Amino acid sequence: MNELGFAAIFCTLIAGGEAETQHGYSAGYDLHRIRVDCETEAEVIEVALDKRGALDSVQQALFAAHLTGKAPVILMIDRDGRTGPYETRIKAAAQMANVAYREIDADFLIRWQMTSYLRNYPAVGAPGL
């Protein structure tokens, strides 16, 4: 599964936010836009896979926070069960920049999506059952 898939699962099923929101900004005479992986009422969350391409996560989270006025967060998707060089670098940079850093297991997200329909029913033993 790719970053976009993990972001959609986390954002909609766990964080209660909106995935892939767009925000515009101007640079000189040009108009540009960014996409935020997950946006909640209080946070902009940059979802990153544990690989080299995630090294720009801190910058992306900070710029999204600048545009929205919300708290920046990095959510690292752990696919191999270990803390590697990229997670170490990103976590250190996030701490230096005062950006929240969170980790979540990729397999957990997949299982959460696969069983989400089960959480749409009332719990056994709930009043009236």
Located regions from the model:
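Structural beta-sheet core signal
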Residues: 44, 73-76
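Active-site metal-binding core of divalent-cation-utilizing nuclease and nuclease-like domains
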Residues: 1-44, 50-59, 65-66, 86-88, ...
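Short, aromatic/basic amphipathic alpha-helical patches
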Residues: 85-97
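Arginine/glycine-rich "motif VI" loop of SF2 helicases in the C-terminal RecA-like domain
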Residues: 63-72, 96
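Short beta-alpha junction loops
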Residues: 75-83, 106-108
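Conserved beta-strand segments of alpha/beta enzyme cores
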Residues: 100-102
